[in-house]
């Protein structure tokens, strides 16, 4: 499996943008789902408290998105799914892999006592599912467009249609023509 630096860099950019979209829309989904959970706050308070927790959390979240995007850009073309489905599938795969760790947050996270209960909460699960689906969709579409190959050349109109409007005989195909038996 060869790895292209340019493909990897464009994937990282797509992942960083997708993570930023995720983080920017969190206030809206907190209102929709009724769960005051902020991923950037979770990441930031794992490292520090106070005024720098949220900006640091945004940086960590964006960096994580870039790493995920770089990996995605190199793996996704080999996944046997339609290109439009690869990003959402990757986002949901990450969700399924990481959601069980929310059961450990109250005990292991430095700010665990201050975090809302996520494990066992249907609205929190729905909120996290939405976020991962959004992330995967933005990542997949942006990476696909950034790393798209050259567009196939479309033949000119004159090349496929003759002056009589029916095409060229040279381009006609004959199916089922049987040669007479010479015997």
Placement of each model-derived feature along the sequence:
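Short amphipathic, positively biased membrane-proximal segments
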Residues: 1-183
């Amino acid at each position: 499996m060869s790895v292209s630096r340019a493909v990897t860099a464009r994937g990282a950019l797509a992942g960083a943008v997708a993570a930023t979209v995720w983080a920017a829309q969190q206030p809206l989904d907190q209102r929709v789902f009724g769960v005051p959970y902020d991923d950037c706050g979770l990441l930031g308070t794992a490292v520090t408290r106070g005024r720098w927790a949220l900006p640091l959390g945004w940086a960590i979240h964006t960096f994580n998105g870039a790493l995920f995007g770089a990996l995605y850009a190199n793996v996704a073309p080999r996944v046997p799914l339609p290109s439009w489905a690869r990003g959402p599938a990757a986002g949901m795969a990450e969700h399924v892999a990481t959601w069980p760790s929310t059961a450990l947050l109250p005990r292991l996270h430095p700010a665990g006592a201050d975090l809302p209960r996520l494990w066992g909460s249907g609205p929190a699960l729905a909120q996290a599912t939405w976020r991962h689906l959004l992330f995967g969709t933005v990542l997949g579409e942006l990476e696909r467009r950034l790393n798209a190959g050259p567009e196939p050349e479309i033949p000119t109109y004159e090349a496929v249609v003759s002056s009589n409007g029916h095409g060229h005989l040279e381009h006609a195909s004959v199916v089922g023509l049987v040669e007479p038996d010479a015997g």
